[in-house]
Every structure is written in C-alpha cells, then in structure tokens.
A protein has these predicted regions:
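Residue-level recognition of transmembrane alpha-helices
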Residues: 17, 45, 89-90, 128, ...
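Hydrophobic/aromatic residues within transmembrane alpha-helices of membrane transport systems
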Residues: 9, 23, 62, 203-206
C-alpha cells in the first residue's frame, strides 16, 4: 500500500495543533465558558487542561510507539484488529471533525459581522468553501497558512493583555473568589472548555 509523504516539520505540526487550541479555545469558547463559570472561568480551563493533559500524554505515548498518521483510528485498529471497528472509529472521527468545524465557523460569524453585515448562512458557506480549497491545496500549504493565522491570533492576545494591563484594577482577588460559581457550574464549563484542547488529536492524526 502506498503511503503519504511526510511533508510536515515539527514547527509546522506544533503550529497546526496550537492554531486549533487558540482559535477554538480563546476566540470561540471564551465567552461561553465565562457565561457559565463566571469569575471561576480560569478554574474551568485549568480543570479541562488537566483532563486533556492525561489524554494528550496517552496520545503522545501511542504515537511514539506507532509513528504513523491516523490517530485514534490507527490505535483502535492495532488494539482490536477488527476492521469494522476501525471503520466505525473513522466515521466517529469524521463526525466530530464536522461538528468542530461547524462550531468554529459559527464562532467566526460573530467576528465577521462586526465589519460586514452578511447573513450567517452565507458567511458559513463561504468560509467552508475557502477552507475546502485550502485543504485541497496540500497539507504542507495548509499548515503554513495555519501557522500564519496562529501567529496573528497569538499577537492579538498579547495586544489585549498589554492593553488590559493599563486598565485600573476594579476588583481584588478575594472579591473574584467570592463571586465565583459553584462546583457544578465550574464542572459544566470545564466540559465545554475541554473542546479547546483538541489540537493534540489533530496533531496525531496528521503526524
């Protein structure tokens, strides 16, 4: 069976995963998590990060033992040796990828409409069409574009942090803790925040 050529370097692969984490986790999910966890938003992201870290270490160990692209589909195929189960896993992965793409496209609409008042369906269709063309261009070219976008995203976050540092401090840390949400809200927000850490799975799938 012919194999795909390895065209991604380590920096491109790292930016490929980081782009998903920053784009989805910060620019799309931040408001949703803050709406549930309120002042405890940081705790929700910390909890989600700890859970995702365990999964990430598992993916890192498995991908080092089986250095082939495929991610979870490959791991299921090796573990159970059942072709039908691998196909089921592939369809599950495709479904979750479609849902992830829909979430990110929906989040992009809010930013786009700040500048141009187009309808949401039109923006989503155009964005999906552009992303399809980029993906069809090639994995290396897509990763380079993602790296550029990721640098812009990180630059935007640094700018926001710099501007926010100049603002007067309105609440003390004690007041923030007193206004924190309960454990139930933090846990619910952590489930949503977990989505922000899907980048490691993308990295394993294309490595």
């Amino acid at each position: 069976m012919a194999e795909l050529r390895r065209r991604l370097t380590l920096p491109l692969l790292a930016f490929y995963g980081l782009g998903s984490i920053v784009g989805a986790g910060i620019y799309v999910l931040l408001g949703e998590v803050a709406g549930i966890a309120q002042a405890s938003m940081g705790l929700a992201f910390l909890l989600a990060g700890l859970i995702a870290g365990l999964t990430g270490f598992s993916y890192a160990e498995l991908s080092s033992r089986y250095p082939k692209s495929g991610g979870s589909v490959l791991f299921v195929d090796i573990a159970f040796e059942r072709p039908w189960l691998s196909k089921v896993m592939a369809f599950v992965l495709l479904f979750t990828s479609a849902v992830s793409s829909a979430v990110i496209c929906h989040g992009f609409v809010g930013y786009f409409q700040l500048y141009i008042e187009w309808s949401s369906p039109l923006i989503i269709v155009l964005l999906c069409g552009v992303m399809f063309l980029v993906a069809s261009w090639g994995i290396r070219e897509s990763a380079i574009l993602i790296s550029i976008i990721t640098l812009l995203e990180v630059g935007g976050l640094i700018l926001v942090c710099f501007v926010a540092s100049e603002l007067p401090q309105r609440e003390s840390f004690v007041q923030i803790i007193d206004a924190s949400a309960g454990i139930g809200a933090i846990t619910a927000a952590a489930f949503i925040a977990f989505y922000a850490f899907i980048g490691f799975e993308d990295m394993v799938s294309v490595a």
